[in-house]
Curated annotation (Swiss-Prot):
Biological role stated in the UniProt entry: Involved in the synthesis of autoinducer 2 (AI-2) which is secreted by bacteria and is used to communicate both the cell density and the metabolic potential of the environment. The regulation of gene expression in response to changes in cell density is called quorum sensing. Catalyzes the transformation of S-ribosylhomocysteine (RHC) to homocysteine (HC) and 4,5-dihydroxy-2,3-pentadione (DPD).
Cofactor(s) listed in the protein's UniProt record: Fe cation
Catalytic activity as recorded in UniProt: S-(5-deoxy-D-ribos-5-yl)-L-homocysteine = (S)-4,5-dihydroxypentane-2,3-dione + L-homocysteine
Cited PANTHER family: S-RIBOSYLHOMOCYSTEINE LYASE
Key words of the record: Autoinducer synthesis, Iron, Lyase, Metal-binding, Quorum sensing
GO BP annotation list: quorum sensing
Lineage of source species: Bacteria, Bacillati, Bacillota, Bacilli, Lactobacillales
Name of the featured protein: S-ribosylhomocysteine lyase
């Protein structure tokens, strides 16, 4: 017998949200009591735009490093299939304001100071699709997202 489940992200009204934003999706406790938080890092407005794969791939690799440099507890940051943002999975309790501040600082570094030598995991040995990267695209999208501002609320624009 198949268990009935509800996938939270499919219940979200993608028309009502106002990207870019950070949204707490869930807080769950593991079998030993450890808290895991799941955040929606929405960089572009759903159904209006999407980040091209090569740029998103490069942003993904950079966020894997830059987030860890700015906050403890990162488990994973994985892109949404719709290419509008990322799931950020963290150990412990974090606020959307904390996470939005970290994302903003990371995007500022991507936009302003990152060079190709700073992008981790771009060789055939270290990446499953190493030819599909674009630092130019990553930088342009980071600038556009920063120009719009990052909110710590998905429905009201409350910029960090």
């Amino acid at each position: 017998m198949t268990k009935e489940v509800t996938v939270e992200s499919f219940e979200l009204d993608h028309i009502a949200v106002k990207a870019p934003y950070v949204r707490l999706i869930s807080e769950e406790f593991g079998p030993k009591g450890d808290l895991i938080t799941n955040f929606d890092i929405r960089l572009v407005q759903p159904n209006e735009d999407s980040i091209p794969t090569a740029g998103l791939h490069t942003i993904e690799h950079l966020l894997a490093k830059l987030i860890r440099q700015r906050i403890d507890g990162m488990i994973d940051c994985s892109p949404f299939g719709c290419r509008t943002g990322f799931h950020l999975i963290m150990w412990g309790k974090h606020t959307t304001t904390q996470i939005a501040t970290v994302i903003k600082a990371s995007l500022e570094e991507i936009a302003n100071t990152i060079s190709w030598k700073d992008v981790p995991g771009t060789t055939i040995e270290s990446c499953g699709n190493y030819k599909d990267h674009s630092l130019f695209s990553a930088k342009e999208w980071a600038k556009l997202i920063l120009k719009q501002g990052i909110s710590d609320d998905p429905f009201e624009r409350h910029l960090v």
